[in-house]
Regions:
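ATP/NTP phosphate-donor binding region
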Residues: 1-93
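Conserved active-site and cofactor/substrate-binding residues in soluble primary-metabolism enzymes
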Residues: 21, 50, 54, 74-77, ...
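Short, well-ordered, mixed-charge alpha-helical segments that flank or form enzyme active sites
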Residues: 103-105, 142-148, 162, 183-186
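Carboxylate- and glycine-rich phosphate/diphosphate-binding segment that chelates Mg2+/Mn2+
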Residues: 151-209
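A gly/ser-rich beta-alpha-beta helix-loop segment of oxidoreductase catalytic cores
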Residues: 135-160
Length: 209
């Protein structure tokens, strides 16, 4: 095991807006990138906790498109679907609302929006990523740290692969963190998120590279 007192160099270019009701800054944040927005979310919890309705109200002057149903351990099929919308609708910015899976999927959607081939190519060979749409996130579950890193993990059931990728183009431009959005998360998933946070911290000292 490495010496846990090792020096390190830490940098994240993501702007973090932390606090209650920071979502109210969303129109200004997204407006800096354009008016066509792709909203990406998972199983629909944002409709139960009111975030979805709030976003609709705030973005009434925007052209809002949606990709819902992003899976835990997001699949490349969801990435493909999102990239298709981005290309067909000339999306300016992607808004990811959810936990790490939604954010990971959204990162590769941003990459694939400028790629003519299959999105899976970008996962297995990050050098093919040359440009990405701007990504803004609203976090609803504290766990992986995907809201301010450049990592993404995507699954491909057809090849039975689950691959992680790191690319500096995948840093979210802005992440909105309102702790009140995590209050509806049940005890089981809150505990799992805490374990996830700790494991990601510990692995930095145990894994080379």
């Amino acid at each position: 095991m490495k010496d846990c007192a090792n020096d390190f160099d830490f940098c994240t270019p993501t702007r973090v807006l932390f606090g209650k009701d920071k979502i109210n800054e969303l129109p200004k944040v997204l407006g800096a990138f354009g008016k066509k927005v792709l909203l990406v979310y998972g199983g629909g919890s944002i409709k139960k906790n009111g975030i979805y309705t709030k976003i609709q109200e705030l973005l009434k002057d925007f052209d809002l498109f949606e990709l819902s149903g992003v899976e835990p351990n997001p699949r490349v099929s969801s990435v493909r679907a999102g990239a298709k919308i981005c290309k067909e609708q000339n999306i300016d910015v992607v808004l990811a609302v959810g936990g790490g899976s939604v954010l990971d999927c959204s990162k590769i959607i941003c990459d694939a929006a400028f790629y003519d081939g299959d999105a899976w190519d970008l996962v297995i060979d990050g050098s093919k990523i040359t440009k990405a749409l701007p990504l803004v996130s609203i976090l609803t579950l504290a766990a992986t740290g995907s809201e301010f890193d450049c990592a993404a993990v995507i699954s491909n059931p057809d090849t039975n692969e689950k691959i992680g990728i790191l690319n500096p183009l995948n840093f979210p431009k802005v992440s909105i963190l309102d702790p009140s959005y995590t209050l509806t998360v049940n005890k089981k998933h809150t505990a799992a998120g805490c374990a996830d946070i700790m494991s990601h911290i510990f692995e930095q000292y145990m894994v080379d590279g």
